[in-house]
């Protein structure tokens, strides 16, 4: 069992309010007939959220490339030749201008990513200044800066950060096949520091990295058994980038991705489930099925860190076709 202060993967000990999800139980959900599974997930979604409201987030890379990690999916690793140029941390003014544009286009949350294994104390000083400036615009803020040292999460919280993104990436059993420079437990430990500091958690994973269905179930089990569950769960479809070890990963059938969205919704009923990276390669019909299966958040903007994303006009047209609307204070409903 892996534990971390204030945030842990639960054991089989009954919890007073949250259900324990075994891998076998989640595998059984995956085996549910497709339309029955989507229908069940849609019911759970409607019990907990306004099904027409989609939370819009914009993601910006504020420090690009040169990461020392060896994540097999990531074009920002310094170990791979992917054409991504290393850039230093951007100036506050440039980031604030991008945040203003994001807000004007309807985003309610501004997410900032930095390609570090983990920030140094001097980096935290700069990042906290950025967070304060973005918060002054009236946006929610989210940061993904890697593994945190003691005290850093508290500094981020004090600066006004709302969410910290730290994905589990994949199941514990598959982790070593994808990443060799850190351990699954390292992720759990940083999540513990984030929770202890009082930050909200954004934590999900990537689908399509040659994992088995059982390993997909293992990822969802790891997420659903975090106590408390993440407020936001981004489900990414692998974006294959030439030069990375996973550039030739096997294709994942679209129904398997929709199944994963549905299972995430059923097992984490009160979490926002974000349809995240990989949308550029999805048809409108596939995205519609994901929304039906319980996805209620997207990244909005033409770029996700260093990979593509659907154009904003295209997202607006799709949402209009599906009678969906951006989430606001007025249309937000979330069950307690």
Curated annotation (Swiss-Prot):
Pathway: Cofactor biosynthesis; biotin biosynthesis; biotin from 7,8-diaminononanoate: step 2/2. The lineage of its organism: Bacteria, Pseudomonadati, Pseudomonadota, Gammaproteobacteria, Pasteurellales. GO terms for biological process: biotin biosynthetic process. PROSITE patterns: RADICAL_SAM. One of its GO terms (molecular function) is biotin synthase activity. It comes from Pasteurella multocida (strain Pm70). It catalyses: (4R,5S)-dethiobiotin + (sulfur carrier)-SH + 2 reduced [2Fe-2S]-[ferredoxin] + 2 S-adenosyl-L-methionine = (sulfur carrier)-H + biotin + 2 5'-deoxyadenosine + 2 L-methionine + 2 oxidized [2Fe-2S]-[ferredoxin]. Residues 52-279 form the Radical SAM core domain. This is Biotin synthase. Its EC number is 2.8.1.6. Its cofactor is [4Fe-4S] cluster; [2Fe-2S] cluster.
């Amino acid at each position: 069992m892996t534990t971390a202060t204030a945030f842990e993967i639960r054991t089989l000990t009954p919890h007073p309010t949250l259900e324990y999800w075994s891998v076998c139980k989640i595998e059984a959900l995956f085996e549910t007939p497709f339309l029955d599974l989507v229908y069940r997930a849609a019911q759970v979604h409607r019990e907990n959220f306004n099904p027409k409201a989609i939370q819009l987030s914009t993601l910006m890379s504020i420090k690009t490339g040169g990461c020392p990690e060896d994540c097999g999916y990531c074009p920002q690793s310094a170990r791979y030749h992917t054409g991504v140029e290393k850039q230093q941390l951007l100036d506050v003014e440039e980031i604030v201008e991008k945040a203003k544009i994001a807000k004007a286009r309807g985003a309610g949350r501004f997410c900032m990513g930095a390609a570090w294994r983990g920030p140094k104390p001097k980096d935290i000083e700069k990042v906290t200044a950025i967070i304060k400036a973005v918060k002054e615009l009236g946006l929610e803020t989210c940061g993904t800066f890697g593994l945190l040292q003691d005290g850093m999460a508290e500094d981020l919280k004090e600066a006004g950060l709302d969410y910290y993104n730290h994905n589990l990436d994949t199941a514990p059993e598959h982790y070593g096949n994808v990443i060799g420079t850190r351990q699954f437990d390292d992720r759990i430990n940083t999540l513990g520091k984030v929770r202890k500091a009082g930050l909200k958690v954004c934590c999900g994973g990537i689908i399509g990295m040659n994992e088995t269905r059982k390993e997909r179930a293992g990822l969802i089990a790891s997420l659903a058994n975090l106590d408390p569950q993440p407020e936001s769960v981004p489900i990414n479809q692998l974006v294959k980038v030439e030069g990375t070890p996973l550039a030739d990963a096997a294709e994942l059938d679209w129904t398997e991705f929709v199944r994963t969205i549905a299972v995430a919704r059923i097992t984490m009923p009160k979490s926002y489930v974000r349809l995240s990276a990989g949308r550029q390669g999805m048809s409108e019909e596939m995205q519609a099925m994901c929304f039906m299966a319980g996805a209620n958040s997207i990244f909005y903007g033409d770029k996700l860190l260093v990979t593509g994303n659907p154009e904003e006009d295209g997202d607006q047209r799709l949402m209009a076709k599906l009678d969906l609307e951006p989430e606001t204070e007025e249309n937000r409903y979330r069950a307690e």
